[in-house]
């Protein structure tokens, strides 16, 4: 059985309208697929500035939709959404329990795969709330380590993750061969 995070509500002042509104954080359901897909598309578009190899069509592809459906419905996946008073999704976090790399010590691993908060809702600890709930879910699943990938140039995200307690661990490097002079 999939451990659940209880829905929670909080009042938030929208930067754009300066009005207070109630936000609700809850686990995603299959009914949220289109809203999560749209947020994921926005995340990819935002991340493209750091990584031009991002496939901006992936979210809408069959593989992208299959991935999101599995994360929402399977017990090894975690997708939490935040909705505003109009029932629009304004944030989400997706993560999953992952297999231990064979070269790592025996332990239980999870990966934070994606997180986004709409710009008008940033700065109100929504991302921290989502991450806190993911950590709680990981503890319920007896996870020892959570990892994530972040673009090395994405300073705001790196600062956010470090504030939570994440530390740099592995370094992935890439060489784009088309940029090398031909021999």
Which role does the model predict for each range below?
Residues 44-68:
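Conserved GNAT-fold acetyl-CoA-binding loop/helix
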Residues 128, 152-170, 181:
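Conserved active-site alpha-helix within GNAT-family acetyltransferase domains
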Residues 114-117, 123-136, 140, 159, ...:
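Conserved acetyl-CoA-binding loop-helix of GNAT-fold acetyltransferases
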Residues 81, 88-97, 111, 116:
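Conserved beta-strand in the GNAT
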Residues 65-81, 111:
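A short helix-loop-beta-strand connector motif used in the catalytic cores of GNAT acetyltransferases and
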Residues 138-149:
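Conserved GNAT acetyl-CoA-binding A-motif
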Residues 1-31, 42, 182-183:
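Conserved N-terminal entry element of GNAT/NAT acetyltransferase domains
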Residues 99-112, 122, 168-169:
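A conserved beta-turn-beta hairpin within the catalytic core of GNAT-like acetyltransferases
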């Amino acid at each position: 059985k999939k451990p659940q995070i209880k829905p929670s509500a909080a009042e938030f002042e929208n930067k754009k309208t300066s009005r207070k509104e109630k936000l609700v954080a809850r686990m995603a359901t299959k009914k949220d697929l289109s809203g999560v897909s749209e947020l994921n598309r926005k995340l990819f578009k935002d991340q493209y500035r750091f990584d031009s190899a991002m496939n901006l069509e992936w979210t809408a592809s069959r593989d992208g939709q299959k991935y999101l459906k599995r994360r929402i419905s399977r017990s090894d996946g975690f997708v939490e959404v935040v909705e505003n008073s109009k029932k629009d999704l304004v944030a989400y976090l997706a993560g999953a329990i992952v297999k231990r790399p064979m070269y790592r010590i025996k332990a239980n691993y999870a990966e934070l795969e994606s997180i986004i908060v709409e710009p008008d809702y940033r700065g109100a600890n929504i991302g921290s709330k989502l991450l806190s709930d993911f950590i709680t879910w990981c503890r319920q699943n007896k996870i020892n380590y959570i990892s994530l990938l972040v673009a090395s140039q994405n300073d705001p995200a790196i600062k956010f993750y470090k504030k939570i307690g994440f530390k740099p661990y592995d370094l992935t490097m890439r060489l784009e061969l088309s940029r090398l002079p031909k021999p």
